[in-house]
Regions:
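Oxyanion-binding "anion nests"
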Residues: 40-93
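Mobile, glycine-enriched helix-loop/loop "lid" segments at the mouths of ligand-binding/catalytic clefts
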Residues: 13-49
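Structured loop/turn residues at beta-strand edges in well-structured enzyme cores
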Residues: 2, 86-89, 148
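Short, small-residue-biased leader/transition segments that mark boundaries at the very start
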Residues: 1-8
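Fold-independent oxyanion-binding glycine-rich loops
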Residues: 9, 16, 158
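Beta-strand initiation motifs
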Residues: 10-12, 177
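Conserved hydrophobic/aromatic beta-strand scaffold that supports enzyme active sites
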Residues: 5, 15, 27, 166-168
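Claisen-condensing/thiolase-fold acyl-transfer catalytic domains that form or cleave C-C bonds
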Residues: 70, 74-77, 92-196
Length: 196
């Protein structure tokens, strides 16, 4: 699931909905990551290489995840719209999790939100997981010459757990820094061999 932090003092309220469909968690799961199966106890039990293999396991039932995205996320967005009596015209963009382009375009079609108002950072960066929402927001404002003080946007995240959420926020475009690309990468000099 994707998250973004936008911390500043504002007078406008923030509206949102959060949901979890825990019974279907096995559709999209990283079964041996996180606190449920801590890494070092797995090393002690299985050895380092097997623990690394377990930690890196990821399972996704693709068609079920697609159905979840196009059913549950659509339902949640429609519930948000109804509960908070809002219109899509109020929002500059819908910054949603960049799972894949097919999900995004079908989601836009189903909720009748203009695809032109959904930044597609997935095209340049791929699925960046929890960074995809703030990346989409920053890409949108860095590609737009704006002097506006604020912009209303919808953010929508969904994914592992099967968790999903939508929040309507007001951002200050001048605080959305441009994304820049570098060719270099930092090499910390560490290797897995150092920790066996």
């Amino acid at each position: 699931s994707s998250a973004a932090s936008d911390v500043y003092k504002r007078q406008e309220p923030t509206y949102g909905l959060l949901r979890s469909i825990g019974r279907d968690f096995k559709m999209l799961v990283s079964p041996f990551s996180g606190q449920r199966h801590a890494f070092w106890p797995m090393v002690q039990k299985f050895g380092y290489e097997k623990a690394c293999a377990y930690r890196d396991l990821f399972h996704m039932e693709g068609m079920d995840v697609m159905r979840f995205s196009l059913k549950e996320v659509v339902t949640m967005i429609n519930d948000f719209k109804e509960r908070f009596v809002c219109d899509y015209d109020e929002y500059e963009i819908l910054a949603c999790h960049q799972a894949n382009k097919l999900i995004i375009s079908n989601l836009a079609r189903k909720i009748k939100f203009p695809l032109s108002k959904i930044p597609l950072s997935i095209v340049d960066y791929g699925n960046t997981g929890c960074a995809s929402i703030p990346l989409a927001i920053c890409e949108h404002y860095s590609n737009k010459n704006t002097s506006q003080d604020s912009g209303k946007i919808l953010t929508c995240g969904f994914g592992i757990g099967l968790s999903l959420g939508i929040v309507g926020i007001t951002v200050e475009p001048q605080n959305c820094f441009p994304v820049f690309r570098v060719k270099e990468r930092y090499d910390d000099g560490l290797s897995f061999e150092d920790y066996k």
